[in-house]
Regions:
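ATP/NTP phosphate-donor binding region
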Residues: 1-85
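Glycine-rich nucleotide phosphate-binding loop and flanking beta-alpha elements
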Residues: 40-42, 93-95, 120, 158
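Short glycine-/acidic-enriched loop or helix-start segments at secondary-structure transitions
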Residues: 43-46, 97-99, 123-124
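Residue-level detector of flexible, active-site-proximal loop/helix-junction positions
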Residues: 58-60, 93, 118
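Glycine/serine-rich anion-binding loops at beta->alpha junctions
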Residues: 84-103
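A glycine/threonine-rich phosphate-anchoring loop and its flanking beta-alpha core
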Residues: 100-171
Length: 171
C-alpha cells in the first residue's frame, strides 16, 4: 500500500494499492452513507455487504442536477445531518456527483471516495473538481471541494473493460 497527502484548497489523503480493507481505518466515527451506481453494486456486491447504499443509475446522462436532487432527497429521508460522512464508491461520474452533493447538502458534509476506475483514480477523484452536466453541457454546474481521502484499490480494476483501462492510462 502506498499513501500520500495532496494539498489543494484543503488536504486529501490518497491511498493506492490493494486497500479496500483499509477503509474502516479511514472512515470517521459516526454515520456513513454510501453512494454508488447500479453497475458497481452489481459487479462488486462484497463492497456493500454491511451497508445500504444509495444507488444512482450509471452513465453520463445521469450526471445531472436531477440526480443531485434525488440523492439529497434520499439523504433527507435517511435523516442525514451535517456530521454524516458521504462515501462515493465508483468511477468519475459517481465521485463527481458525490462531491457535488456533499458540497451542497446542508451547506457541506464531509466526504471521501473509493475510486473503482483507473481514470477516476488519476483524474476525477483527485482533482477537487466536482461537477454535473446542465442542458447538454458538460460540468456546467460544479464546485471545488477536496475529499478527506481517496482510495484507489487496483484490485477493483479487474472487472474493467480494456477500453476503460486505456482511457485511464491516456489521462
Amino acid at each position: 500500500m502506498m499513501s500520500y497527502s495532496l494539498q489543494v484548497a484543503g488536504r486529501s489523503r490518497v491511498v493506492v494499492g490493494r486497500t479496500v480493507e483499509e477503509l474502516p481505518r479511514l472512515l470517521p466515527q459516526g454515520r456513513v452513507i454510501v453512494l454508488t451506481d447500479r453497475n458497481v453494486a452489481r459487479c462488486r456486491p462484497e463492497l456493500f455487504e454491511d451497508c445500504d447504499p444509495i444507488c444512482m443509475e450509471p452513465g453520463e446522462e445521469y450526471k445531472t442536477l436531477q440526480t443531485v436532487e434525488a440523492v439529497c432527497r434520499e439523504l433527507i429521508r435517511r435523516g442525514a445531518d451535517r456530521t454524516t460522512f458521504l462515501l462515493g464508491v465508483g468511477g468519475g461520474i459517481v465521485t463527481d456527483v458525490t462531491g457535488f452533493v456533499a458540497s451542497v447538502y446542508m451547506r457541506g458534509v464531509p466526504f471521501g471516495f473509493v475510486s473503482t476506475t483507473l481514470l477516476g483514480c488519476v483524474d476525477a477523484s483527485v482533482g477537487g473538481k466536482n461537477g454535473v452536466n446542465l442542458d447538454g453541457y458538460k460540468n456546467m454546474a460544479g464546485v471545488f471541494a477536496q475529499p478527506q481521502f481517496v482510495v484507489c484499490d487496483t484490485s477493483l480494476f479487474a472487472t474493467l473493460p480494456l477500453r476503460e483501462i486505456r482511457a485511464g492510462l491516456a489521462e
